[in-house]
């Protein structure tokens, strides 16, 4: 499972400071760091499908770790518009949009991984029978949505009070 924290924050800062590609690269690097701290995958032999028996653990790592953190860097699509406005209100809107966009993409990766790899876990925990997608949506939302809100709020504080964090040194 996931946890509530600030894991998206460095990716968001780099995505706004440097743009889309550096944000994506930073997300990929964060994914590697997260995996160095330990990974949890379902044993492929527990699947009925022979493809998932072989490729399941790899696909789960790709969705739950590599892609989940890498896509947060897509917040960088708002970097140029953020930097090109003088309005504090618009800057706040752009960091909220980017934080939500990157965070929701991460959430989608976790929901897809959960729907595919955690079959029938809902009945074990919450009585949600035979609907791994609903279980995954609820379970992952319980920590992804607070993460989006927390990181978005910190980014708003940065945009309002510490905006130099979100601009490269070569921009005055």
Residue ranges and their predicted role:
Residues 1-172:
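Loop-helix junctions at membrane interfaces
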């Amino acid at each position: 499972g996931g946890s509530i924290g600030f894991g998206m924050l460095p990716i968001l800062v780099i995505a706004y400071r440097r743009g889309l590609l550096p944000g994506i690269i930073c997300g990929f690097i964060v994914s590697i760091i997260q995996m160095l701290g330990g990974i949890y995958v379902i044993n492929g032999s527990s699947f009925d499908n022979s493809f998932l028996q072989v490729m399941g653990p790899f696909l789960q790592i790709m969705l739950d770790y590599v892609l989940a953190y890498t896509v947060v860097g897509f917040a960088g699509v708002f970097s140029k518009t953020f930097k090109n406005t003088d309005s504090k209100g618009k800057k706040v809107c752009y960091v909220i949009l980017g934080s939500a966009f990157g965070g929701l993409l991460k959430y989608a990766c976790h929901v897809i991984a959960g729907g595919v790899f955690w079959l029938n876990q809902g009945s074990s925990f919450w009585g949600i029978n035979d609907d791994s997608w609903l279980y995954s949506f609820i379970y992952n939302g319980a920590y992804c949505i607070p993460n989006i809100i927390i990181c978005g709020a910190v980014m708003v504080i940065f945009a309002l009070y510490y905006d130099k964090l979100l601009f490269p040194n070569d921009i005055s």
